[in-house]
């Protein structure tokens, strides 16, 4: 993806404005209680900015995958179209109210909220009900998505996107509304996400290691292919490692393996070798005969998995090897766990990687980025999330960004016009970069070494021209 500088909420007046903010409040809810409020907390800086500047917030989000109803469907006698108890955002309104320490109004129908919007005053916050209760939100038919977008756009003066987690979706609330309003601004979370990914993809401190795990090679093909041209080390773990190991002729027992992807695995390993990327695969394993937790799983002595056993985590030798590689790198990006970390007996590999990255970040200045989804959950569970440079809120979005794809929800936002070269430059991704630490292009001077050389050449050229003209004038005067 070409990451282009985008206008943010710092670039627009917010006073007395009704600001429609697309947030990602797709949080886990159990028995009406939110079990992890990370995504809600991540949106607070943007909300607080609008309130501080004298605007009012209209928040919209999805939660889960409700079946939904069409806008044209008959309205039920009680309730709203498409409503599902398990997917209501009402618990989120209560949680947000506690975090903001102020009342958060709730509109039970996102497309019939005009009366709630009309009552908004400076500093007020309104949360709309789940936008996915209407199928038009994710409709592939442009006219349907546009119809929903027009209703939502009518509520507001400005549109702000802070939902990086759904930035890979071309939907009514991500792309339709800014199209209707003619502009769209990045919130602080969106800005931060793109800034960090731009840095690690475009100009990372080196060496750079990509740690890739998860179940299937097929899920990470595009990521691996795109990253091979950017990284120095590739660390592979999780079930996908055993497709690579079988491709190398190793014994993998009954471990998960994509038989139809063996040639692809060989091809990726060959490409890595051609590009000078060192690939590291597990050299020992934590195994069991069944996919279940046990008190004492088998730890192999070498790379081969015994017959009748499946590998469910990386072993201690592999952990040590991976820790050493992370320790010698300046940047690390991690997408996918090393094992079945949800079971404590198979969590050591994943948690060790998290610990190595967290320690490296705090002690040695490692640029560490966690790619959302299960990896973010693992980092949280390990207690190391707080020590990372950045933990992404977007699983699918971060994956597509690492695959080199364009994110529709980012591309639609208003481009930033950069005039001249001020002292505070911004990263080409849309993130503010007021310091050398946060902007990749400023680590070697204002625009890197190339810029400095160019300026020196210009100065020398101007000096030589001046000397030449001066000599000609002196010659004429003497004559």
From Swiss-Prot:
InterPro entries recorded for this chain?
Pgk_euglenozoa (IPR027250), Phosphoglycerate_kinase (IPR001576), Phosphoglycerate_kinase_CS (IPR015911), Phosphoglycerate_kinase_N (IPR015824), Phosphoglycerate_kinase_sf (IPR036043)
UniProt keywords, alphabetically: ATP-binding, Glycolysis, Glycosome, Kinase, Magnesium, Metal-binding, Nucleotide-binding, Peroxisome, Transferase
Write out the residues that bind (2R)-3-phosphoglycerate.
23-26, 39, 61-62, 64-65, 132, 168-169, 216
UniProt cofactor(s):
Mg(2+)
Name the positions where Mg(2+) binds. 215, 219, 374
Q: Which Pfam families match?
A: PGK
A Gene Ontology biological process noted in the UniProt record is:
gluconeogenesis
Q: Where does CDP bind?
A: 214, 219, 238, 336, 341
What's any one GO cellular component for it? glycosome
Protein EC: 2.7.2.3
> Which terms does the record give in the GO molecular function aspect?
ADP binding; ATP binding; metal ion binding; phosphoglycerate kinase activity
Identify its protein family.
Belongs to the phosphoglycerate kinase family.
- PANTHER family in the record: PHOSPHOGLYCERATE KINASE (PTHR11406), PHOSPHOGLYCERATE KINASE 1, CHLOROPLASTIC-RELATED (PTHR11406:SF23)
Q: How does it assemble?
A: Monomer.
Q: What is this protein called?
A: Phosphoglycerate kinase, glycosomal
Species of the source: Leishmania mexicana
């Amino acid at each position: 993806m070409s990451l282009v500088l985008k206008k943010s909420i710092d670039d627009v007046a917010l006073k007395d404005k009704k600001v429609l903010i697309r947030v990602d409040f797709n949080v886990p809810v159990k028995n009406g209680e939110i079990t992890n409020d990370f995504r809600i907390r991540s949106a607070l800086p943007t909300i607080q900015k609008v309130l501080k500047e004298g605007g009012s917030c209209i928040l919209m989000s999805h939660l889960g995958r409700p079946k939904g109803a069409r806008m044209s469907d008959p309205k039920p006698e009680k309730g709203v179209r498409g409503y599902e108890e398990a997917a209501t955002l009402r618990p989120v309104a209560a949680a947000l109210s506690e975090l903001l320490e102020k009342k958060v109004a709730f509109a039970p129908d996102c497309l019939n909220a005009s009366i709630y919007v009309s009552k908004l005053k400076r500093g007020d916050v309104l949360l709309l009900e789940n936008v996915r209760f209407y199928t038009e939100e994710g409709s592939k038919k442009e006219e349907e998505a546009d119809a929903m977008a027009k209703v939502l756009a009518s509520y507001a003066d400005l549109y702000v996107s802070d939902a990086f987690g759904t930035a890979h979706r071309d939907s009514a609330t991500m792309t339709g509304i800014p199209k209707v309003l003619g502009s769209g601004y990045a919130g602080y979370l969106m800005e931060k996400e793109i800034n960090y990914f731009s840095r690690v993809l475009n100009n990372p401190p080196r060496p750079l290691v990509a740690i890739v795990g998860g179940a299937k090679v097929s899920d990470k093909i595009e990521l691996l292919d795109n990253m091979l041209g950017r990284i120095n080390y590739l660390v592979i773990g999780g079930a996908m490692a055993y497709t690579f190991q079988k491709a190398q002729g190793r014994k993998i027992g009954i471990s998960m393996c994509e038989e139809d992807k063996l040639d692809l695995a060989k091809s990726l390993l060959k490409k890595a070798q051609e590009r000078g990327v060192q690939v590291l695969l597990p050299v020992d394993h934590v195994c069991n005969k069944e996919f279940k937790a046990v008190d004492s799983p088998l730890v192999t002595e070498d790379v081969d998995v015994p017959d009748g056993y499946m590998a469910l985590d990386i072993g201690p030798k592999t952990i040590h090897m991976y820790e050493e590689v992370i320790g010698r790198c300046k940047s690390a990006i991690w997408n996918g766990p090393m094992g079945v970390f949800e079971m404590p007996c198979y969590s050591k590999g994943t948690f060790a990687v998290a610990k190595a990255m967290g320690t490296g970040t705090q002690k040695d200045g490692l640029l560490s980025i966690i790619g959302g989804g299960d990896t973010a959950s693992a980092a949280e569970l390990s207690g190391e999330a707080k020590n990372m440079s950045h933990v992404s809120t977007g699983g699918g979005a971060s994956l597509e960004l690492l695959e080199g794809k364009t994110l529709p929800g980012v591309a639609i936002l208003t481009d930033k016009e950069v005039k001249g070269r001020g002292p505070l430059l911004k990263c080409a991704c849309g993130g503010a970069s007021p310091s050398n630490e946060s902007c990749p292009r400023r680590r070697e001077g204002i625009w890197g070494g190339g810029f400095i050389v160019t300026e020196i050449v210009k100065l020398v050229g101007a000096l030589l021209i001046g000397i030449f003209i001066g000599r000609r004038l002196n010659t004429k005067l003497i004559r």
